[in-house]
Amino acid sequence: MDASCNAKPAVVAVVGPTATGKTALGVALAQQFSGEVISADSMQIYKGLDVGTAKVTPQETCGIPHHGVDILTPEKTFSVADFTALAGEYIQDITARGHLPLLVGGTGLYVQSLLYGVRFTAEKAPDGLREQLTAELEAIGPEAMYAKLQAVDPEAAAAIHPNNKVRVLRALEHYHATGKRLSEQKADSLPPERPYRSLVLGLDFPERAALYRRIDLRVDKMLEAGLLAEAEYVWRNRETFRTAAQAIGYKEFFPYFEQTAALDACTEKLKQASRNYAKRQLTWFRHMDGVTWLDAGAADVQQTALRLTQEFLSKG
């Protein structure tokens, strides 16, 4: 890759719902095309949260550099604007060294904001707004707060789980601070052209049952790998690990630690929450322009992805 010209940097993205094999495909592409992986996962940035976030292991990296993993302690916050700025630096550095940036992950807002060049305003929320909304949430509960978001920004609400209090609060905070819905912000903040030349490969299974079986199996393997201890670590620090405490994979076990639910019930709740999350991920990526979808269960999925990537790079 020639970094000396003024052409847009080339970026290949591997996206899709959880448990579709994105990590393995990203590594395979990196091995073939001298690539480096940039994580597009909103939870894998946190140190010490390995099992519940399905963080890539040293063995799984196969020596391929992975950026955007293990960079913050769990009490820190990390916004989509932070991600686009950091990932942009990674892309510039990787491209300058003659390597291919590979964006791999399932956080659709991260992928779309980076590749489509969404600009984020520097407007700061009025002092006390977050505290006011938080107090309101505690007073009326998450369901009523989610209903408020549905009333002012149904499009944003559709992409957020009703129990994800952090994202519900952020969306409401944005609306009250700017007078605009997040969907309007997206439209207003799109620049005339995209900052990168990109190929977006989406992984999914033709049969939804196949994906759900993989999700259930992944949860079982996570428990064997120490998920419960990690979830207890988050539970004990839930007042400071606010983002992690809302994450799928941890919060489902809080009733078990509080001795109000059995472990089996919490495990089933996690499996259901993971399946629901996968559906929301698919909804997001299906609405994204320019995604080339691949059958994650096909025997030749890697070969197909390699061929498409080769064709994409040859056009540069």
Locations of the language-model features?
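Phosphate/pyrophosphate-binding catalytic cores of soluble transferases and nucleic-acid-acting enzymes
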Residues: 1-316
